[in-house]
């Protein structure tokens, strides 16, 4: 199975073709470029990886709202500022993404899973962690990856570093940014990410207050040592975080566990994700795609119709 993080792949295309997108005169032209780039990219993944990972493609998209932001309002709070500084027309970007999600639902042969409060990587994590034995699905979603993970080889298409914690013998990751497989450096564990936080998502390290990335700071954040990472690891695995660490640090450890550890995606989301895929009804067909591409004058996509 090939699991595609829709937003991640879509934005990789936008940044790679930023000059072409900047020349778009209106939304229609922008979406035309976006459609062509996205579909060509997905087909390239299918052609490149299907022999090893199979021809099943599932697309995971970000839903409205975000459960993490409800628990931690500063989560990804600085993203809007970064977008403003990019020079891109983000109204065009988001409109094109919405258009393509709807086209995937109605025209193309791939399931797209989008649920309220969930990010695409949440959907991917739940699908990857799904036990091979269906009867265990309700009670044991998050069995350790590896032999108790997915029965088939799975490729995650995403540049998101959070996906590293899903790697196993049968689960690999391909980055649309670097166009290469993602590897894990020796000694890396999820406990390092918990201790250090995730600057890209606005999650500070366990020494820093919640608003570290949203307010001017008088100095650099206090560094997190390997010794501290080891202590965090031991405290979490032994269930002694609140005993070992001062109250403020312990609270931040729990904050970061909830924000970055995919084993802590709330269980209320597990069944809806799995049922969304299991009960998904594909509406697309080659006939509908052919009519659509002819109407758009998308000759290059029309020529690749048999590859969908």
Briefly describe each language-model feature range.
Residues 1-155, 168-181, 261, 267-279:
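Noncatalytic, basic helical substrate-engagement surface that gates or grips nucleic-acid strands
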């Amino acid at each position: 199975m090939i699991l595609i993080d829709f937003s991640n792949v879509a934005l990789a295309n936008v940044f790679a073709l930023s000059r072409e997108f900047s020349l778009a005169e209106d939304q229609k032209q922008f979406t035309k470029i976006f459609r062509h780039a996205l579909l060509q990219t997905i087909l390239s993944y299918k052609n490149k990886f299907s022999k090893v990972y199979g021809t099943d493609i599932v697309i995971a998209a970000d839903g409205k709202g975000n459960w993490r932001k409800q628990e931690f309002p500063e989560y990804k709070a600085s993203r809007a500022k970064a977008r403003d500084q990019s020079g891109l027309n983000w109204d065009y970007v988001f409109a094109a993404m919405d258009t393509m999600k709807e086209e995937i639902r109605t025209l193309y042969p791939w399931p797209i899973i989008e649920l309220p409060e969930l990010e695409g990587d949440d959907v991917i994590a739940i699908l990857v962690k799904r036990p091979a034995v269906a009867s265990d699905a309700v009670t044991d979603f998050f069995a350790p990856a590896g032999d108790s993970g997915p029965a088939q080889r799975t490729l995650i298409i995403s540049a998101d570093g959070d996906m590293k914690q899903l790697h196993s013998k049968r689960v690999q990751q391909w980055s649309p940014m670097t166009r290469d497989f993602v590897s894990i450096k020796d000694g890396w564990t999820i406990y390092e990410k918990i201790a250090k936080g995730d600057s890209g998502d606005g999650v500070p390290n366990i020494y820093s207050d919640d608003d570290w990335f949203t307010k001017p700071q008088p100095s650099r954040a206090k560094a997190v040592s390997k010794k501290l990472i080891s202590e965090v690891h031991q405290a979490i695995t032994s269930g002694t975080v609140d005993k070992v660490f001062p109250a403020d640090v312990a609270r931040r450890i729990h904050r970061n566990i909830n924000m970055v550890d995919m084993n802590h995606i709330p269980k209320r989301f597990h069944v809806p994700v799995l049922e969304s895929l299991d009960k998904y009804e594909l509406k697309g067909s080659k006939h509908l795609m052919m009519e659509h591409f002819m109407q758009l004058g998308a000759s290059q996509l029309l020529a690749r119709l048999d590859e969908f």
